[in-house]
């Protein structure tokens, strides 16, 4: 991404589009039910052993704390590369086993590779969320809602693409999980960077909010498109191919925002080549002295809600622990259901449970989008 494109203001929007694409392919933690039955039959596992494999996958996300610490000292591109390589190894090993290209690995080895696959998404999530929230400090709620919404949709995207083109084959599904995120993350390293954001006037803030409404609208259209494909039953080969093409077009549609921003606000030559002449002597800032009492007060002052916190400042707040306990108690039940969706469907007599996984993903997306918009309304 050239300096002209970055300075024009479209650079951070292109970075957001790259982040959306990363999120659209990194929801692989929620796809275990698509291939869990294949692992169970191939490795002759009991239901308890299969559940422990899903736990190993979820434990990988618990190590996401490492990605959070690393985000303060490593650039976005390095975080994305770590996540893509880890996912390629973790899901690649599972693909080799399910496709019978190698002999089944031992149980503990499979636990390690599932843990790696689960942890890979934390690096991708951290990279895009931290970078985009720093690029859009006044719209953190919409940014979070959009990016986490696409994570929810990613399960439906993977599931429906695999169903449309490969008839829900577990080995092909795992191959896609291993390769596609690696390709997208490596591509995103060229576009997703932290861009210094100058103070905006009210007009620019309104325009930024309008752009986020466009992103939300595109995401909702994509969700409805996936929902329509799921509820319309079986499709022929031609319709499935048409669906796949339409899905790729919808995923590319967010590019219209940075393109419009680039065309509508081009930089003039004077903005680039002629620096502003500023007197070095006139308008010198007045020096002020700070008393010891005032200095101690400034050092003790904590950032308010909505401002950047260090990790130490964060764990000292009551709000963090409320969120932590709520997340700890609430997410586990949902993950338990999603991990066992395949076994539940088979127990109820369904040979293909992909539609249930996809529908769960789509409705999860609507909840994520709503939470981002509502939280932004009350915080700002």
Give the label of every model feature segment:
Residues 90, 102-124, 328:
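Hydrophobic core of transmembrane alpha-helices in multi-pass small-molecule transporters
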Residues 51-62, 136-191, 205-229, 363-366:
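Glycine-rich segments within core transmembrane alpha-helices of 12-TM secondary carriers
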Residues 11-12, 34-69, 76-80, 352:
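Extracellular/periplasmic helix-loop-helix junction of adjacent transmembrane segments
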Residues 52-73, 86-92, 96, 156, ...:
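Central cavity-lining transmembrane alpha-helices of secondary-active solute carriers
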Residues 85-103, 189, 226:
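C-terminal ends and interior cores of transmembrane alpha-helices
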Residues 32-35, 39, 120-148, 158-159, ...:
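Intracellular juxtamembrane helix-capping segments at the cytosolic ends
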Residues 28-39, 143, 222-238, 304-306, ...:
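Extracytoplasmic gate region of multi-pass secondary transporters
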Residues 192-322:
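Long, low-complexity inter-transmembrane loops of multi-pass membrane transporters
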């Amino acid at each position: 991404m050239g300096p002209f494109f970055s300075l024009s203001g479209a650079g951070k929007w292109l970075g957001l589009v790259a982040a959306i694409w990363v999120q659209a392919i990194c929801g692989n933690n929620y796809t275990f039910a698509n291939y869990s039955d294949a692992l169970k039959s191939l490795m002759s596992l009991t239901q308890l052993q299969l559940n422990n494999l899903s736990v190993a996958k979820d434990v990988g996300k618990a190590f996401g704390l490492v990605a959070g610490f690393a985000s303060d000292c490593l650039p976005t591109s390095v975080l994305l590369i770590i996540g893509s390589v880890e996912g390629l190894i973790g899901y690649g090993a599972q693909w080799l086993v399910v496709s019978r290209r190698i002999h089944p690995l031992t149980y503990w080895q499979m636990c390690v590779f599932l843990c790696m696959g689960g942890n890979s998404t934390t690096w991708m999530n951290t990279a895009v969320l931290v970078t985009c929230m720093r690029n859009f400090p006044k719209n953190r709620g919409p940014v979070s809602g959009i990016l986490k919404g696409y994570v929810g949709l990613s399960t439906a995207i993977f599931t429906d693409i695999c169903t449309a083109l490969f008839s829900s084959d577990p080995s092909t599904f795992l191959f896609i999980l291993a390769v596609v995120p690696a390709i997208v993350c490596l591509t995103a390293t060229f576009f997703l960077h932290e861009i210094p954001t100058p103070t905006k006037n009210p007009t620019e803030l309104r325009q930024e909010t309008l752009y986020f409404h466009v992103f939300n609208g595109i995401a909702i259209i994509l969700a409805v498109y996936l929902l329509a494909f799921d509820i319309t039953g079986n499709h022929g080969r031609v319709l499935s191919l048409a669906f796949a093409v339409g899905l790729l077009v919808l995923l590319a549609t967010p590019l219209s925002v940075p393109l419009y921003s680039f065309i509508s606000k081009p930089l003039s030559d004077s903005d680039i080549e002629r620096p502003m002449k500023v007197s070095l002597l006139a308008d010198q800032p007045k020096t002020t002295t700070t008393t010891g009492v005032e200095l101690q007060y400034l050092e003790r002052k904590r950032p308010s809600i909505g401002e950047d916190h260090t990790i130490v400042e964060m764990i000292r707040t009551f709000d963090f622990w409320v969120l932590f306990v709520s997340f700890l108690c609430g997410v586990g039940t949902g993950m338990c259901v999603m991990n066992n969706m395949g076994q539940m469907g088979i127990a109820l007599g369904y040979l293909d449970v992909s539609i249930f996984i996809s529908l769960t993903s789509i409705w999860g997306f609507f909840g994520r989008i709503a939470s981002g918009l509502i939280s932004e309304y009350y915080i700002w």
